[in-house]
């Protein structure tokens, strides 16, 4: 039986340079939050908590699951849209 990491390794991601499909509107807003839930809940690990309290986002490898969209919807600090056609996650099952 395969581990989830092995299955995720088979997926590919086509980066749309200069056009990320997720954007943190105000990075300073995240420093005010005591819990940075996106850094824990994102299955792809796209969010990182920095030592200064800020949250950085790298969308390369995003699974487009929408978890961050749900977690951050109350704050309204996240801009999330589907990637353009031909870009984003390319699932490979096998």
Swiss-Prot record:
<keyword id="KW-0408">Iron</keyword>
<keyword id="KW-0813">Transport</keyword>
<protein>
    <recommendedName>
        <fullName>Ferredoxin-like protein</fullName>
    </recommendedName>
</protein>
<keyword id="KW-0249">Electron transport</keyword>
<comment type="similarity">
    <text>To ferredoxins from P.putida and C.tartarivorum, ferredoxin I from A.vinelandii, ferredoxin II from D.desulfuricans.</text>
</comment>
<dbReference type="GO" id="GO:0005506">
    <property type="term" value="F:iron ion binding"/>
</dbReference>
<dbReference type="InterPro" id="IPR017896">
    <property type="entry name" value="4Fe4S_Fe-S-bd"/>
</dbReference>
<dbReference type="InterPro" id="IPR007859">
    <property type="entry name" value="ETF-QO/FixX_C"/>
</dbReference>
<dbReference type="Pfam" id="PF05187">
    <property type="entry name" value="Fer4_ETF_QO"/>
</dbReference>
<dbReference type="GO" id="GO:0051536">
    <property type="term" value="F:iron-sulfur cluster binding"/>
</dbReference>
<keyword id="KW-0535">Nitrogen fixation</keyword>
<comment type="function">
    <text>Could be a 3Fe-4S cluster-containing protein.</text>
</comment>
<feature type="domain" description="4Fe-4S ferredoxin-type 2">
    <location>
        <begin position="53"/>
        <end position="83"/>
    </location>
</feature>
<keyword id="KW-0479">Metal-binding</keyword>
<dbReference type="InterPro" id="IPR012206">
    <property type="entry name" value="Fd_FixX"/>
</dbReference>
<keyword id="KW-0411">Iron-sulfur</keyword>
<feature type="domain" description="4Fe-4S ferredoxin-type 1">
    <location>
        <begin position="20"/>
        <end position="52"/>
    </location>
</feature>
<keyword id="KW-0677">Repeat</keyword>
<dbReference type="GO" id="GO:0009399">
    <property type="term" value="P:nitrogen fixation"/>
</dbReference>
């Amino acid at each position: 039986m395969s581990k989830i990491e092995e299955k995720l390794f088979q997926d590919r991601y086509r980066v749309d340079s200069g056009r990320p499909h997720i954007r943190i509107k105000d990075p300073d807003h995240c420093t005010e939050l005591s819990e940075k839930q996106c850094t824990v809940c994102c299955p792809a690990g796209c969010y990182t908590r920095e030592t200064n309290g800020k949250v950085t986002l790298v969308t390369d490898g995003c699974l487009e699951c929408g978890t961050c969209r749900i977690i951050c919807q109350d704050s309204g600090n996240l801009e999330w849209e589907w990637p353009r056609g031909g870009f984003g996650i390319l699932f490979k099952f096998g």
